[in-house]
């Protein structure tokens, strides 16, 4: 079938397509005209390879993510499993908040920071929670980097999902179940420090 554009993003374009007779998603990093041609080609190639690797590593760690069917570094394209289901941002519940916390801790346990940890990047497929979009992910052992993931999801849960009572608390419960209380408390302290810096910057 002819690929159909379903989302045009700042970093990549997303197409609905098929692969070996199965529904699939094609993610293509389009060239950036403001970058030097060779530099742009190198950046898109490296980011494509890195994202595909992160998806595979996350899956091995027990995090549901789309299967990678094909990677074309030259054309900066990843063809992956199409996940049928509903976006978590539309069906959020306390139980899903807890599961998102568990997934986040699993990801951080293998030193991967997601980089865009929002409810928009989770899909619930029947009873399977799937984490999407590793395009901004990176390796880090720094507590402050991990805290940026928690800071973002905390902000999202407090603003977009205010109707879910105790959403971030349920997230933390899930996180503690994997990371343990001591490590989680240390990360949350970093989250508070980031928040304080943000408030100070707005005041000054």
Where are these regions (language model features)?
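ATP-binding glycine-rich loop module of kinase domains
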Residues: 2-49
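Short hydrophobic-acidic sequence motifs that mark active-site Asp/Glu residues
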Residues: 16, 23-27, 79, 131-133, ...
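Conserved hydrophobic "DFG−1" position in protein kinase catalytic cores
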Residues: 16-19, 28, 70, 82, ...
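Short strand-connecting beta-turns/loops that link adjacent beta-strands
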Residues: 19-22, 73-75, 126-127
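Conserved structural core of kinase catalytic domains
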Residues: 30, 34, 44-48, 52, ...
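Short glycine/proline- and charge-enriched loop/turn segments
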Residues: 32-39, 86, 133-135, 150
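Conserved kinase catalytic-core helix
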Residues: 55-63, 87-120, 125, 129, ...
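C-lobe/activation-segment region of protein kinase-like
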Residues: 130-204
């Amino acid at each position: 079938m002819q690929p159909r554009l379903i989302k045009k993003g700042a970093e990549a374009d997303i197409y609905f397509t098929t692969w070996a007779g199965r529904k699939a998603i094609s993610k293509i990093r389009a060239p950036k005209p403001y970058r030097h041609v060779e530099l742009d080609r190198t950046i898109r190639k490296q980011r494509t390879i890195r994202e595909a690797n992160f998806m595979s590593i996350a899956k091995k760690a027990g995090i549901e993510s789309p299967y990678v069917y094909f990677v074309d570094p030259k054309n900066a394209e990843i063809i992956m499993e199409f996940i049928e289901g509903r976006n978590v941002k539309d069906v959020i519940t306390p139980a899903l908040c807890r599961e998102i916390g568990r997934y986040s801790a699993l990801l951080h346990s293998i030193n991967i920071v997601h980089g865009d940890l929002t409810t928009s990047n989770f899909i619930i497929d029947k009873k399977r929670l799937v984490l999407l979009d590793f395009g901004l992910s990176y390796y880090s052992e720094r507590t402050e980097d991990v805290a940026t993931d928690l800071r973002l999801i905390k902000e999202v849960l407090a603003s977009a999902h205010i109707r879910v009572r105790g959403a971030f608390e349920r997230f933390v419960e899930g996180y503690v179940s994997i990371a343990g209380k001591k490590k989680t408390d240390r990360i949350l302290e970093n989250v508070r420090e980031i928040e304080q810096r943000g408030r100070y910057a707005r005041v000054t």
